[in-house]
Curated annotation (Swiss-Prot):
Keywords: Cytokine, Disulfide bond, Glycoprotein, Growth factor, Secreted, Signal. GO terms for cellular component: extracellular space. This is Interleukin-12 subunit alpha. It is found in: Secreted. GO terms for molecular function: cytokine activity; growth factor activity; interleukin-12 receptor binding. It comes from Bubalus carabanensis (Swamp type water buffalo).
C-alpha cells in the first residue's frame, strides 16, 4: 500500500500546480530554526518572506489589480523546469504498486540532507527547485532595478525576500550557469512594472509553498 505521507504530498503538489488562484492572504505560523539550519528552515523562511512581501504589495498597490482574482496568472518557469513532476515521491514516480526500492544513493554537496546522500530522483527535484529560485531571483532583481527608478518610489522589493532566495540557493549548492540579465529596450512603464510585480509575487508564493511542502517531506523521510 502506498504510504499515506506520499499520497498527501502528491495531492498537495498537484493542487498547487493546477490551482493558481489559491488564496494567498493567510498568515503563516512562525517557526524557529534549529542549530545548523536545514533546507526546510530556509524554505520556511522563504515562504514567510514572500508572503509578507506579497501582502505589502497588495496593500500598497490596491488600485493596481493585485489580488489573485484580478491578475493574469503567469509561470515564468513553464517549459523551463518541471519541479512538480521532478519532486514526485520516488515510490509513486517509479512504480505504480508503490513497492519500488530507493535508487542507489550518492554524495551531494548541498546541505538539504544531513547525510549528504540522496537518490537520483531527489537530486533532480532539488536541482529543479534551484533552477526555479534562480529564475525568480533574476526576474525580481531586474524588476527591482526598474522600481527604484520610479520617481514616486511607491513600492520596491523587500531585501529580506531576495536574501531568503539566495540563502536557499546557497544551501542547495548546485553548480549552474549564470542567467544573463538582458536590459529591456522598451520604454519604462511603471504601471505595467507594478502589475507585473503582483503577477510574479503571486506565482512565486505558490512555488514557495510547493518547495516548502517538498522540503518538509524530504526532512521527514
Amino acid at each position: 500500500m502506498c504510504p499515506l505521507r506520499s499520497l498527501l504530498l502528491i495531492s498537495t503538489l498537484v493542487l498547487l500546480h493546477h490551482l493558481p488562484h489559491l488564496s494567498l492572504g493567510r498568515s503563516l505560523p512562525t517557526t524557529t530554526a534549529s542549530p545548523g539550519r536545514s533546507c526546510l528552515d530556509y524554505s520556511q523562511n522563504l515562504l514567510r518572506a514572500v508572503s509578507n512581501t506579497l501582502q505589502k504589495a497588495r496593500q500598497t498597490l490596491e488600485f493596481y489589480s493585485c489580488t489573485s482574482e484580478e491578475i493574469d496568472h503567469e509561470d515564468i518557469t513553464k517549459d523551463k523546469t518541471s519541479t512538480v513532476e521532478a519532486c514526485l515521491p520516488l515510490e509513486l514516480a517509479t512504480n505504480e504498486s508503490c513497492l519500488a526500492s530507493r535508487e542507489t544513493s550518492f554524495i551531494t554537496n548541498g546541505r538539504c540532507l544531513a547525510s549528504g546522500k540522496t537518490s537520483f530522483m531527489t537530486t533532480l527535484c532539488l536541482r529543479s527547485i534551484y533552477e526555479d529560485l534562480k529564475m525568480y531571483h533574476v526576474e525580481f532583481q531586474a524588476m527591482n532595478a526598474k522600481l527604484l527608478m520610479d520617481p514616486k518610489r511607491q513600492v520596491f522589493l523587500d531585501q529580506n525576500m531576495l536574501a531568503a532566495i539566495a540563502e536557499l540557493m546557497q544551501a542547495l549548492n548546485f553548480d549552474s550557469e549564470t542567467v544573463p540579465q538582458k536590459p529591456s529596450l522598451e520604454e519604462l512603464d511603471f504601471y505595467k512594472t507594478k502589475v507585473k510585480l503582483c503577477i510574479l509575487l503571486h506565482a512565486f508564493r505558490i512555488r514557495a509553498v510547493t518547495i516548502d511542502r517538498m522540503m518538509s517531506y524530504l526532512s521527514s523521510s
